[in-house]
């Protein structure tokens, strides 16, 4: 296959950051994504409807396409049921996000114990707001490669049991454990999968030298988990959909003695997913994963226009602009096999 036309995709998990970098991040994500779920882990985080709506306006102010940001509340131990009801009433906030305190970038204000937000989850279940989950424990005694599976067993299974009508997205899954859990759970439980977790495993990050631009959270796992993710994405199951978790950091914040977690893929997201699906002979499953399963789960209409991918190799720049600095993208200086037709 040398050409593939699909319904315009959406990104159900992206970090746009804030301030002077928005022009660059919104350009890259909005180039061919119709909508995106915007992560709220700013400094300070978007913890209430007012801060979420103000962030929405800052994003829209730099949009040059019809791209529509879908806003998310950042949950804390102090979030209230009234915060949820106000966010739902806004029409712009579609979900609320659990960051276990300290799990990832700018998560220090997150939830210290999920039981602290049970009244909030009750309100979310009542009003029909989705619950997005960064599924890792933060206990320093738990091996970093085991933190997702431990979170599922110790926390998420109980939440799913306690809130059977709550729609839950386990974000950026990285393990066979997560695939099996989502597949075995009710139709109210789904997951996003990133392009980099489909294309890479921990050998790419650690073998033959440390490659900091592959360092993200949840961390890349062994190749058996990568294969499980590919099988899930290409299975045709409606429970899995596109979420890039594209997370820009300035070059010097990544190439450092203590580098930041996050991989940048917004420059070529759908192209990278096309490579991943092609690698398992499943290009025919890409459209549902990228364009149908997400809006269907969120109860939103599918996009009505389309994009066309062509099999044409192109070289990725060494950096992309990021405010007054630069971000090193995944596949920098290398080629990608697919390209979106202008």
UniProtKB/Swiss-Prot annotation:
It holds the Pfam family Amidohydro_1. Homodimer. Transmembrane segments: none annotated. Catalyzes the reversible cyclization of carbamoyl aspartate to dihydroorotate. Zn(2+) 1 binds at residues 13, 15, 97, 245. Binds 2 Zn(2+) ions per subunit. Belongs to the metallo-dependent hydrolases superfamily. DHOase family. Class II DHOase subfamily. Keywords: Hydrolase, Metal-binding, Pyrimidine biosynthesis, Zinc. It catalyses: (S)-dihydroorotate + H2O = N-carbamoyl-L-aspartate + H(+). Substrate binds at residues 15-17, 41, 134, 217, 249, 261. Its EC number is 3.5.2.3. This is Dihydroorotase.
């Amino acid at each position: 296959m040398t050409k593939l036309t699909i319904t315009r995709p959406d990104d159900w998990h992206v970090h746009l950051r804030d301030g002077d970098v928005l022009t660059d991040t919104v350009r890259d994500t909005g180039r061919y994504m119709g909508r995106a779920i915007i992560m709220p882990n700013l400094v300070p985080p978007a913890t209430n409807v007012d801060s979420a709506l103000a962030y929405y306006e800052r994003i829209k102010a730099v949009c040059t396409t019809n791209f529509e940001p879908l806003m998310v509340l950042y949950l804390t131990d102090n979030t209230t049921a009234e915060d949820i009801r106000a966010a739902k009433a806004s029409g712009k906030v579609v979900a609320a996000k659990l960051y276990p305190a300290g799990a990832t970038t700018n998560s220090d204000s997150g939830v210290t114990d999920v039981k602290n937000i049970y009244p909030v989850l009750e309100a979310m279940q009542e009003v029909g707001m989705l619950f997005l989950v960064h599924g890792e424990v933060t206990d320093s005694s738990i091996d970093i490669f085991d933190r997702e599976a431990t979170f599922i067993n110790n926390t998420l299974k109980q939440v799913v049991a306690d809130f059977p009508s709550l729609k839950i997205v386990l974000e950026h899954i990285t393990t066979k454990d997560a695939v099996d859990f989502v597949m075995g759970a009710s139709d109210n439980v789904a997951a996003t999968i990133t392009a980099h977790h489909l294309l890479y495993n921990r050998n790419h990050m650690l073998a033959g030298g440390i490659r900091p631009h592959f360092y993200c959270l949840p961390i890349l796992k062994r190749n058996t988990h990568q294969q499980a993710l590919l099988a899930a994405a290409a299975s045709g199951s409606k429970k899995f959909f596109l979420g890039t978790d594209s997370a820009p950091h300035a070059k010097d914040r990544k190439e450092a003695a203590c580098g930041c977690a996050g991989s940048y893929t917004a420059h070529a997201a759908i192209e990278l997913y096309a490579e991943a699906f092609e690698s398992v002979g499943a290009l025919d499953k890409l459209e549902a994963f990228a364009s149908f399963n997400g809006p269907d789960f969120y109860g939103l209409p599918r996009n009505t226009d389309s994009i066309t991918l062509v099999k044409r190799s192109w070289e990725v720049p060494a950096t992309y602009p990021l405010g007054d600095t630069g971000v090193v993208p995944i596949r920098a200086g290398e080629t990608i096999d697919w390209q979106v037709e202008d």
